[in-house]
Amino acid sequence: MATPQLSPGVLVREVDLTVGRADNVLDNIGAIAGPFEIGPVEEVTNITNEQDLISVFGEPKNNDAQYEYWMSASSYLSYGGVLKVVRADDDDLKSANAGVGIASTTTLKIKNYDDYVNNASDTSVNFLYAAKNPGSWANNLKVCYIDDFADQTLGVSTANLSNAGATVGAGVTAAISGVLPGSGSTSVFTGYVKGIITGVNQDADGASTIDVKIVSRVSSAGAETRIDYAEGDSFSSFGTSNPLFFVNSVGVNTGALGSQATGTTAASAVDWYDQQTLGLSNSTIFWSTLAPKPGTSVYVSDRQGHNDQLHIAVVDDNGDVTGIRGNILEKHIDLSKASDAVSNVNAPQRTYYKDYLRDLSANIYAGADPLAAADAFHGTTPAATGFTAYTGVKAASFAPETASTNQSGTVAQDKQFLAIGAKTYTIMGGNDYQTSGGDGYKADLGKLITAYGLFSNKDEVEADFIIMGPGCTTEAESQAKANFIISISESRKDCMSCIGAHRENLVAAAGTPGGSLLTTEQQTTNLLRYFGPLTSSSYATFDSGYKYTFDRFNNRFVYIPTNADVGGMMARTALLAFPWFSPAGQQRGVLNNAVKLAYNPSKAQRDRLYPKRINSFITSPGAGTFLFGDKTALGFASAFDRINVRRLFLTVEQALERAAQAQLFELNDDLTRANFRNIVDPYLRDVQAKRGLIDYLVICDETNNTPDVIDNNEFRADIFLKPAKSINFITLTFVATRTGVSFSEVAGRV
């Protein structure tokens, strides 16, 4: 090849002939969908252990045998696998919420994070706060809110505050004079402290109060300086020694700027924040014990904004969720009303309260802005916390900020955000599945199929075992569910479906924790009738089991299906041995957490079941309960009618498919083909050494990569495998011979 250099020099080139390799395949990922108590709806969630299952999807419930779904998931996890779980939807499923102007809206359903972002995160929604996911679990949770509404509560001895000029939005001033400490110096100051009234509480007996937000300090020469409230500091707060003067933009009780004809001495002056509680029914918790007073964040202050901070706490007031009254589930401090706010400590963490709760709260989403309008039902009225200007005439310096431009969700620049003070919202109206007659957990077949459909795309969701769990109400629905799950595996061709029996075919009374009321002959006939019409597939397994196990959450024994255990056994076999070993038998097929079986078939009954693709679970004295069959659901004789062969091919195919992807867009020549053979051959030799193959052959040369194949931009490799077979049938022949007979005369003849 001619050098690309045009003048003397050294060109360094690299050629990589190591592209691609056959990586190990860890196939221990199960998948199940069902009507769980809590958790995101129609969203695939990774679960690694039972504690994760409890945290994300709640505990098992007695209603509608929902525990069968939950305990099937738990059973699979007990074998060492990981699980992908989808919570199925339902038309009756609704999210608990605090409505806008009402207790709650009855139509709200926020399925998951994406559903909130796409459909429920703008300000036009009809809820203020909503549970993170649907269901009754969040009913009566309290969302406690507080912002920088006021600095002080001042007592005013009058029965008519408006006549005195003390109305929301009006200014309040008090004359001050004295030595003002500065930075390394002092100065004599004469002027007044200026604030804005944010709340009034009129008392008929004259013990009225006003809530005041400190705004600025104004000198006698008219120079105005923004200040922050400092309790007990006469230059930064109001006291009981100097008269209060109420002033609005047109001059209440007209007089010089910042004064009026007659002053009113405050009867009392207390810190507003110190008086605020979370507003709970069963306990009294002061906000000051949880966090410092909200004020202005560094981000907003740097942009000449004010009063953006707020705190939010989520409290289990009645103990319905945690069993502890007044239990604080979450506490979110120093959130912001500014839509562009960023944490000064954990940048670039966004602190806008809706974004923050969306990403970091475990229990709630935020909806409509409570600062957008007054809410008579919840008793909130947004109040201005400052004036439009801080110099000049009353018309500007005592005109409250415009409400529409200072709501939550606006950018920080030059904003003086409105406030509503301390408010507690009760979220309610959450409903469970098919709630007629009480909280239910009956999953609709159509919704279950939609949920399982989320596992269909193998490029998006990794799955090795799709677990059916329990069947549906009728046998026909159970068969429809089973066939759909099998179709997923047939379409993906990289996983297996674990199909179980219809409950009423084995246990006569659904939901009854007692023993089976059916004879074994009836159970056998029922199983043959149920499994007979199901789709023939080597990507599925059928089993006969329902096991009797203890439900520690409801303190009782229950029957649950064993198809999740079959998936778990295959995962355990891959972890402890290799995927191409059979998961059945006393070594690898032992059933976890089983007291007894609903159906323990005899040899004669197994002889009827096994030819019909049904693997039995049996209990054997001295050996325990284990899987006694390793057939796939294939309806005809083939090497793929055994689980270990199908699992061998799944493992090899996945490993070599990844290796083949590295050959895409390479040149189809001897070098590429040799490189691919050098990847495949050592891998298959290793599988053979580990007892997965009897023999193999790899053809990837000019015999199958003909000129026509090459011209069609194709690459072909033919891989022939002789899979190892599991032992299903054992014959022991004992022959008695006469003393004088030589064994060579009779060996092989009987």
Regions found by a protein language model. Give the residues of each.
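Extended assembly-interface regions of large multimeric machines
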Residues: 1-318
